[in-house]
Amino acid sequence: MSKTIDYEKIPGHWLLASLGKTVLRPGGLNLTKKMLDQLNITKDDHVVEFAPGLGVTARLTLQHDPHYTAIEQNEDAANKVRSYLTGSRQQCHIGTAEKTGLPDNSATIVYGEAMLTMQSAKQKQQIIAEAKRILKPGGKYAIHEMCLAPENIDNALKESIQKDLSVAIRVNARPLTIAEWKQVLEEEGFIVTEVKTAPMHLLRPKRMIQDEGLPGVIKIASKVICNPKARKRVLKMRAQFTKYEQYIQGVTMVAQLPEK
C-alpha cells in the first residue's frame, strides 16, 4: 500500500486511516458518543449520515436499529460502507452532502462529522440547507466539527490557524467559533439545543488510547516508525495541533427544526 500513496499530498485524515487510525473526529470518540446520546436514536427514526467513512459512528448508530441511509460520493466509498450494513433498513446512496438525492422531509435525524470544517462558507450553507430539506419538521441535525476559541479570537490569528492547518492536513480547514457555528445553523432555521466541546487532542497518546485502545495504538505506532515519509507528515500535523491547541477544540452541536 505504501507504494501507491503520495505521503506528501494525501489528505491528513486518509493518511491517518492508512496507518490504522479509525477515529478521525476532532473531539474523539467520546464526543461522538455524547452527540449520539443527545440524538437519542430509536428504531423508529430515519437516520441519514453524511460521509460515514470508516463507519465508527455508523456502527454505534446501528446498534439502535433505526432506518439508516448513508451518503457517500462514489461507488468505492459506498461499497466500503455497504460491507457493514445489513438488512433492508440499512442502505448507502451515491450523492453529496450538498445534493443527497433523497426526498424532502424523509429523515428524522441527520448528522455529519469532520465535514463542514473543510468547506467554504457557501458550501457550509449548502450542506446545512440540504440537511434542512430532507428533515421532517421537528427533525434533528447534529454536527461534530473543529471550533476556534475564544469567541473574540483575533482575525489575524484565525487566518494563521486556518492557513497552517490547511498546509499540514492538505485540506482547506475553515473552523469557526462556537457562536459562528450556531449562527450558520440558525440562519437555515435550526434551533441549537445542545453544545459540547472537547480538546483537539487527535494525536495525543492519551486520546489515541481512548479512541483506538492500546493494541490499536501500538499497531499505528509501529507503522509510523517503519514509514519515514508517513512519520514526517504525522509529526507536521501533530506540531500544528500542538502549536494551536489553546485555540482549537472539537465541538458537537445538536440543532432542531421547529415543529409545524
Language-model features: locations:
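Conserved alpha-helix/loop element of class I SAM-dependent methyltransferases that forms part
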Residues: 25-43
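Conserved class I S-adenosyl-L-methionine
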Residues: 43-53, 142-164
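Class I SAM-dependent methyltransferase SAM/SAH-binding core
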Residues: 52-99
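A short acidic, Gly/Pro-enriched loop at the edge of an enzyme's catalytic core
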Residues: 98-110
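A short glycine-rich, Lys/Arg-flanked "PGG" loop and its adjoining helix->strand segment in the class I
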Residues: 125-140
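Short alpha-helix
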Residues: 173-188
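Conserved Class I S-adenosyl-L-methionine
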Residues: 194-260
